[in-house]
């Protein structure tokens, strides 16, 4: 997700290198502020189906016009569960993007409240003007029903889907067991 506005998906011929074959087709999808890894998978599955339907006949009839890749191919390392650990000193938008990127079907973003490991599945940027000047990063400053607001370095994040057993105002969420 990484603050990007679009995702470009390529299909290409396989070569001995990593993702460096000639490009057969390329399509893009928007990444909007409501997307998460699951909705991006949905979008990708739609365009991949379209790309294969459009290009398999061309490949079988030797009518495909390939494009040579320019520059170094890029790829991301395999994601691990530890990648989901929330660092509450980051900006609320960076934390929001992390949660969006590692939600289902991935292992999820997580934090600790004392000894309890809490998985956070959904959140939204809440506000940058409301201040809690005496609150620490990661401190729960408000609770609404089963949602809670967390103080971050530059604003507030509303946690809307989590597996915490019990939370209290003034609880401090951390990146490690305390």
Residue ranges of predicted features:
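Donor/substrate-binding cores of folate-linked one-carbon enzymes
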Residues: 1-75, 81-82
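Generic signature of intrinsically disordered, low-complexity segments enriched in small/polar residues
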Residues: 44, 55, 78-79, 109, ...
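An anion-binding loop in the catalytic cleft
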Residues: 89-178
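Short, charged low-complexity intrinsically disordered segments located at boundaries
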Residues: 28-31, 73-90, 123-133
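Active-site-lining helix/loop region of Rossmann-like oxidoreductase modules
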Residues: 57-112
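A generic secondary-structure signal marking the coil-to-beta-strand transition
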Residues: 10, 21-22, 84, 116, ...
């Amino acid at each position: 997700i990484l603050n990007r506005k679009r995702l470009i998906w390529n299909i290409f011929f396989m070569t001995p290198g990593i993702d460096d074959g000639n490009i057969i087709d390329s399509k893009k999808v928007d990444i909007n502020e409501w997307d998460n890894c699951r909705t991006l998978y949905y979008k990708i599955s739609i365009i991949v189906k379209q790309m294969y339907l459009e290009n398999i006949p061309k490949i079988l009839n030797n009518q495909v016009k390939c494009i040579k890749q320019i520059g170094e191919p890029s790829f991301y390392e395999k994601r691990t569960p530890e990648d989901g650990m929330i660092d509450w000193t980051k900006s609320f938008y960076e934390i929001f993007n992390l949660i969006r990127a590692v939600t289902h079907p991935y292992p999820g973003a997580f934090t600790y409240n004392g000894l309890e490991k809490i998985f956070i599945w959904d959140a939204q940027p809440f506000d940058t003007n409301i201040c809690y000047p005496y609150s620490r990063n990661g401190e729960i400053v408000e609770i609404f029903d089963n949602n809670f607001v967390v103080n971050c370095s530059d604003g507030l994040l509303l946690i809307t889907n989590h597996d915490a057993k019990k939370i209290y105002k003034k609880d401090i969420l951390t990146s490690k067991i305390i």
